[in-house]
Curated annotation (Swiss-Prot):
Assembly, per entry: Component of the WAVE1 complex composed of ABI2, CYFIP1 or CYFIP2, BRK1, NCKAP1 and WASF1/WAVE1. Within the complex, a heterodimer containing NCKAP1 and CYFIP1 interacts with a heterotrimer formed by WAVE1, ABI2 and BRK1. CYFIP2 binds to activated RAC1 which causes the complex to dissociate, releasing activated WASF1. The complex can also be activated by NCK1. Binds actin and the Arp2/3 complex. Interacts with BAIAP2. Interacts with SHANK3; the interaction mediates the association of SHANK3 with the WAVE1 complex. Interacts with ABI1 (via N-terminus).
Modified residues (Phosphoserine): 489
MF annotations from Gene Ontology: actin binding; Arp2/3 complex binding; protein kinase A binding; protein kinase A regulatory subunit binding
GO cellular component, one term: protein-containing complex
Biased composition (Polar residues): 304-313
Protein's recorded name: Actin-binding protein WASF1
Amino acid sequence: MPLVKRNIDPRHLCHTALPRGIKNELECVTNISLANIIRQLSSLSKYAEDIFGELFNEAHSFSFRVNSLQERVDRLSVSVTQLDPKEEELSLQDITMRKAFRSSTIQDQQLFDRKTLPIPLQETYDVCEQPPPLNILTPYRDDGKEGLKFYTNPSYFFDLWKEKMLQDTEDKRKEKRKQKQKNLDRPHEPEKVPRAPHDRRREWQKLAQGPELAEDDANLLHKHIEVANGPASHFETRPQTYVDHMDGSYSLSALPFSQMSELLTRAEERVLVRPHEPPPPPPMHGAGDAKPIPTCISSATGLIENRPQSPATGRTPVFVSPTPPPPPPPLPSALSTSSLRASMTSTPPPPVPPPPPPPATALQAPAVPPPPAPLQIAPGVLHPAPPPIAPPLVQPSPPVARAAPVCETVPVHPLPQGEVQGLPPPPPPPPLPPPGIRPSSPVTVTALAHPPSGLHPTPSTAPGPHVPLMPPSPPSQVIPASEPKRHPSTLPVISDARSVLLEAIRKGIQLRKVEEQREQEAKHERIENDVATILSRRIAVEYSDSEDDSEFDEVDWLE
């Protein structure tokens, strides 16, 4: 049904019924036709005025927009051509705080609304019959709907279309969200490396070159296959004759004994010693080779020292502790694997620092012994880390006052080397008391009085009171007799300026969030009957990678 905007009356000039009693009918028809022509001319003039008036209004609005655009272009041209780079007209803060430009042009939407109804259509609408007065029943409805909308609702089709568009947009957003969640929950599968293709023709060409050249090429090919496909054997899928041919010429069993031993030696040198494994146990001697191992307690540390007779040095100091020693440190960088293997085969137990000088030199050159040096690693020797220092057997006191009586109560008696070797192994010493218990019996002190020869100088060369046998405890471990009471600090209270600043920052953040929320709500209100916005929103959701790219996303504010 076409919608007539302008209707010219009358349509027919001469189609009129003549009244009765007219004698001159021709003159009457002429007058009626002339009057209808005048009426039509008046209608045409009226509609012409409407048409040209609309054209004038459109031209006026167009000229106004062009003039405003020209003024803006002139201002920009002046700013661009006459801009002084030395003078900063706008600060960086003003530029960042300025909002993005938004056009204020109102797009033509809802063309068939009551507000956009033209005057000729309004006149035609006024001629029509009015609907029944159903709005009178609206206050009596419980659902709040207008009563007239059940009879006539101009926005029915638009509301139906809008609801369908918004529902489709929401469904697509939910589908994308589910797909994204599914991708996050799915574990990341490692990429599978394809197996290298097998070139049989190349292998036969290498075999045709001769057994000498084929041997090196086959070794190189085997290395490449192991690098590409891992240690899994690739030759199992080949014919059995080719495997036999390869194994027969240069297999390990076909090598002479000298080459085989050399390969095994190289393989042993490639073995890395793990730093966290304990050292190998000493070899077990036979019943006839068993030698007594003297045991002593060091006067400096109170630790038990077993000194087995080594064939190389005569004695090898080894620390023995009631508790298992900590794991050994890693190998130094300067230590080679060959020297390590040689030292492990020659010296079974892992020794510590080099042995002290023999007793003869100690008797001939009496001197004050230096303080115990830190443990050093001999070249080619692995040893466990030194055990922790045992707690002192006497009550803690200043180190200078403690050194003299300790030196006096520990006499040193040198023993000949033959007696040391002929003595039977002494019984195991009693365990050391815990740190918190003070020893009540002098058993441990008497055990300290007979160390083996060669460990300490003679009584004539004993160190004086100024040389402490035990390392002095650090000052941090000295417990003061009386601790001063701690009083509450009398520092000035921090000013409230910092808290006020933090409160202002929190309020600013909260205000910013409220402003963003209001802007978002204003966008949602703008969607109400905006056809272009609804369509653009749907297109944005369809073609975006994520649901967050949409300009209007109410999920962040509604959830």
